[in-house]
């Protein structure tokens, strides 16, 4: 073989090898779209100061949100919504405050010894005049337990105040000892709760706190026991006189109106038990005079009402 031909062959071989190398390099450098050939990054993650601050702020925000959720204070509106007694108390207390500021007389009408056969008529009359009152009930003076249940719940449903007076109203027995007194008060309290699910908070002693049946034990024994049950007791400073069975409706009317004229705040004693027809007859006229002639504000007793109590 001639020398020139050898050189040509060598040149072709070198060129071919060079071409193969270039092709191989191109294939190796071509990106792997599937990522399967990408080397995993096993280097440790380094959190920069900025990253750390951002993370910290995020964590703080999350913590703050948690604290806000768990520590949100109960608003006054939520409290009154949860406690309807408080809402009612505030309502009538504000009316009393406004009445005093306006120079109006305040009258609390109270009815003892129900619920009896006259109670439904009394409730209807109060409804007619848009008036709320207070009822101090006696268990044994109701015609039946079912009747008592209906009337007690009607009193509450109509937004009157339901208080306790006595289970038997037998003063000679009730005041003979502290144990006898406790039995009577506990019995009427539990009776009202059984029939209504309502826990009374106001009471009136049979005969009032100045009754001669109790003597000095009223102050030393009976009043402390009533207070220990969370009860507020109320006497009266105006009497209708309807405890006298021979009284007329005219006399009831005059006793109430004349008594109220002399006071800025009156707690009026009346009765809705059987035998007090004169009171039922006088009631519409009493309400008409108190509201339309004397511009009185008539309210039910609440826990904010200043008690009228006998001096000892």
Could you say what each language-model-derived stretch is?
Residues 6, 65-70, 75-81, 275, ...:
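Catalytic-site microenvironment of enzymes
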Residues 169-269, 273-292, 297, 304-312:
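Catalytic domains of cell-wall/extracellular-matrix polysaccharide-remodeling enzymes
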Residues 29-104:
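N-terminal, intrinsically disordered, polar/charged segments of Gram-positive cell-envelope systems
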Residues 17, 123, 283-284:
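Short amphipathic alpha-helical segment that frequently serves as the phosphate-/nucleotide-binding helix
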Residues 17-27:
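Hydrophobic alpha-helical membrane-insertion segments, chiefly the h-region
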Residues 1-16:
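N-terminal Sec-pathway targeting helices
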Residues 134-136, 163, 204, 234, ...:
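Structural detector of well-ordered beta-strand residues that form the stable sheet scaffold
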Residues 82-199:
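Active-site beta->alpha N-cap acidic-glycine motif
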């Amino acid at each position: 073989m001639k020398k020139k031909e050898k050189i040509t062959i060598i040149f072709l071989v070198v060129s071919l090898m060079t071409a193969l190398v270039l092709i191989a390099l191109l294939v190796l450098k071509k990106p792997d779209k599937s990522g399967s050939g990408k080397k995993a990054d096993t280097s440790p993650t380094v959190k920069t100061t900025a990253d750390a601050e951002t993370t910290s702020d995020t964590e703080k925000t999350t913590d703050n949100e948690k604290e806000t959720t768990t520590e949100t204070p109960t608003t006054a509106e939520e409290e009154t919504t949860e406690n309807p007694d408080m809402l009612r108390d505030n309502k009538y207390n504000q009316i009393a405050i406004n009445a005093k500021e306006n120079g109006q007389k305040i009258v609390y009408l109270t009815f003892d010894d129900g619920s009896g056969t006259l109670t439904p008529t009394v409730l209807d009359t109060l409804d007619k005049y848009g008036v709320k009152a207070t009822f101090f009930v006696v268990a044994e003076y109701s015609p039946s337990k079912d009747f008592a249940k209906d009337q007690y719940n009607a009193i509450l449903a109509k937004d009157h105040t339901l208080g306790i007076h006595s289970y038997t109203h037998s003063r000679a027995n009730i005041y003979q000892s502290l144990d006898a007194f406790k039995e009577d008060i506990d019995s009427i309290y539990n009776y009202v709760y059984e029939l209504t699910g309502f826990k009374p908070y106001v009471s009136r002693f049979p005969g009032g706190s100045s009754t001669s049946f109790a003597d000095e034990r009223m102050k030393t024994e009976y009043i402390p026991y009533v207070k220990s049950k969370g009860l507020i007791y109320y006497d009266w400073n105006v009497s209708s006189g309807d405890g006298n069975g021979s009284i007329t409706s005219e006399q009831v009317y005059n006793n109430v109106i004349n008594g109220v004229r002399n006071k800025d705040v009156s707690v009026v004693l009346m009765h809705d038990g059987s035998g007090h027809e004169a009171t039922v007859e006088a009631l519409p006229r009493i309400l008409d005079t108190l509201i339309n002639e004397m511009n009185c504000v008539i309210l039910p007793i609440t826990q904010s009402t200043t008690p009228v109590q006998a001096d000892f």
